[in-house]
C-alpha cells in the first residue's frame, strides 16, 4: 500500500491524522453519547494507531498478515521499538497511555477497576463502561476509520489522474467492506457513498 503511487501522496503520519480526524468526528455521533474520555481515547488511539509502523519503517498490515508467523515477531519488534525509542522520552503515565493506544490498536477495550486492560466482546462498549473512569476506546471505530481513510486516499488519487489497477481494485474492495458497516448508530455507507 505504502509503495503504490498516489496523488496526493500520503505519508504514514498524514494517514494517521486523517484517521484521527475521522475518528473524532464519528465519535461525536455514537449512540448513546460517548463520555469525554472515550472521545479523547478514540482521537489519540486513531492518531497513534500506526505509530509502531513509523518506528519499524512502515511494514504495512497486509505484508504482516501475509507473513503469518512472522507477524508475531514483527509485533514484538514494534513493541521493542516503542519501548526503546519512546519510553526514555515520556513520563511513565504518558508512556503507558501510548501503549494503551498502540497495543492491539483495533481492539475495543476499557480499563477495569484495577486498571487492567479488558477487551470487550462484540466490539461494543456497554453503557456501564461509557464513563471516564473506565477509559473506553472503540477499536472497531478506529479500524473502520482506517479503512475509510484508505478508501478516500484511493478515491482522491483516482480523480486526480492516478488510476492504477491496484488503486481501482483497492477502492472496490474497501467500498465492499464498508458499505454495510454500522457503528453504534452510524451508517458508514452514508459517508462513503459520497465518494463512489
Q: For the regions a protein language model found, what residue spans apply to each?
A:
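Alpha-helical, largely C-terminal catalytic domains
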Residues: 1-196
Amino acid at each position: 500500500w505504502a509503495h503504490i503511487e498516489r496523488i496526493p501522496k500520503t505519508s504514514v503520519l498524514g494517514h494517521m491524522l486523517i484517521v484521527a480526524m475521522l475518528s473524532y468526528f464519528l465519535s461525536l455521533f455514537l449512540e448513546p453519547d460517548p463520555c469525554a474520555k472515550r472521545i479523547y481515547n478514540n482521537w489519540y488511539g486513531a492518531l497513534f494507531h500506526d505509530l509502531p509502523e513509523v518506528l519499524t519503517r512502515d511494514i504495512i498490515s497486509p505484508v504482516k498478515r501475509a507473513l503469518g508467523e512472522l507477524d508475531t515477531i514483527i509485533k514484538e519488534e514494534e513493541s521493542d521499538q516503542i519501548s526503546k525509542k519512546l519510553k526514555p522520552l515520556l513520563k511513565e503515565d504518558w508512556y503507558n497511555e501510548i501503549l494503551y493506544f498502540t497495543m492491539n490498536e483495533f481492539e475495543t477495550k476499557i480499563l477495569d477497576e484495577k486498571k487492567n486492560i479488558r477487551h470487550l466482546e462484540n466490539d461494543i462498549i456497554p453503557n456501564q463502561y461509557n464513563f471516564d473512569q473506565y477509559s473506553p476506546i472503540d477499536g472497531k471505530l478506529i479500524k473502520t476509520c482506517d479503512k475509510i481513510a484508505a478508501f478516500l486516499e484511493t478515491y482522491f488519487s483516482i480523480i486526480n489522474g492516478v488510476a492504477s489497477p491496484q488503486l481501482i481494485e483497492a477502492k472496490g474492495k474497501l467500498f465492499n467492506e464498508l458499505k454495510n458497516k454500522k457503528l453504534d448508530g452510524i451508517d458508514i455507507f452514508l459517508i462513503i457513498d459520497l465518494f463512489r
